């Protein structure tokens, strides 16, 4: 288990990094206490998940919706049933969610391997990294809880059966956002063009609009979305600060 922090120039928070087993996070917080509480929340969530897997190994490997109870795994199973994917599709954002809840502060952002959960009292700019030439950013305003989760068929180690550079969901429910990002990414075929992606997004919105604020797909030169798209920002994403293993 390891953690470190660095000053972030020009803003009123510090950037921390925390790693424990598969959990690799970047945390933005205003003080060490919030950071420590966030870590405590993530370790609590991991502990329940690991204990559940020890008693029910299928939970770890299934790609199908799953039935289970529990404070942590219950959120994952609920999301898996909504999205039609396995419960581990929601693991990163669910762990981050508990970190945000345990932090008990007005400003905390946790990026767990590219899945972001935030409680903030001032706007922040969030970037979606799709390679150096295709990355975008958008502004997220003050919120009690917000999640920006991304699945990619081209970047990262998470399972995706699709070919999107990025399939991103914005939602007030992090577990559902994570699971639905996986589901959306799986729907994007290798040869899909703009019209194909827009058709997928329209159907996706009809099915899931009550759970999400916005869905975004980036593939090759196509940028498409449905829902309430945040204000787009020009960003230069530094690959060195991207949260990844």
PLM feature spans:
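A general structural signal for short secondary-structure junctions and capping/turn motifs
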Residues: 17-18, 159-160, 206-207
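Short, mixed-charge, low-aromatic patches
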Residues: 1-6, 33, 51-62, 134-140, ...
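N-terminal, positively charged, Ser/Thr/Ala/Gly-biased leader segments
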Residues: 1-23, 27
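N-terminal low-complexity or amphipathic/hydrophobic leaders
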Residues: 17-76
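Alpha-helix boundary/capping residues
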Residues: 45, 184, 204-207
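Flexible, glycine/charged-enriched surface loops at secondary-structure junctions
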Residues: 52-67, 107, 113, 191-220, ...
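Conserved mixed alpha/beta catalytic, RNA-binding, or beta-rich assembly cores of soluble enzyme
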Residues: 74-85, 89-201, 224, 229-245
């Amino acid at each position: 288990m390891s953690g470190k922090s660095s000053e972030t120039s020009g803003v009123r928070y510090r950037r921390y990094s925390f790693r424990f087993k598969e959990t690799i996070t970047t945390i933005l917080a205003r003080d060490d206490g919030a950071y420590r509480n966030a870590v405590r929340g993530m370790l609590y969530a991991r502990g329940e998940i690991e204990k559940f897997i020890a008693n029910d190994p299928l939970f770890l490997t299934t790609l199908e919706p799953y039935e289970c109870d529990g404070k942590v795994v219950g959120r994952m199973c609920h999301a898996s049933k909504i999205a039609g994917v396995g419960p581990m599709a929601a693991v990163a954002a669910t762990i981050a969610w508990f970190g945000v809840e345990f932090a008990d502060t007005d400003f905390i952002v946790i990026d767990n391997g590219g899945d972001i959960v935030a409680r903030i009292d001032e706007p922040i700019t969030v970037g979606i990294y799709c390679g150096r030439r295709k990355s975008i950013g958008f502004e997220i305003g003050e919120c009690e809880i917000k999640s920006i989760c991304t699945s990619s068929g081209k970047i990262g180690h998470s399972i995706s059966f699709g070919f999107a550079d990025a399939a991103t969901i914005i939602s007030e429910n992090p577990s559902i956002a994570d699971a639905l990002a996986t589901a959306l990414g799986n729907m994007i075929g290798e040869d899909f063009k703009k019209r194909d992606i827009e058709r997928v997004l329209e159907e996706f919105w009809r099915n899931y609009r009550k759970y999400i604020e916005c869905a975004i797909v980036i593939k090759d030169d196509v940028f498409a979305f449905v829902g309430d798209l945040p204000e787009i920002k020009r960003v230069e994403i530094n690959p060195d600060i991207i949260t990844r293993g």
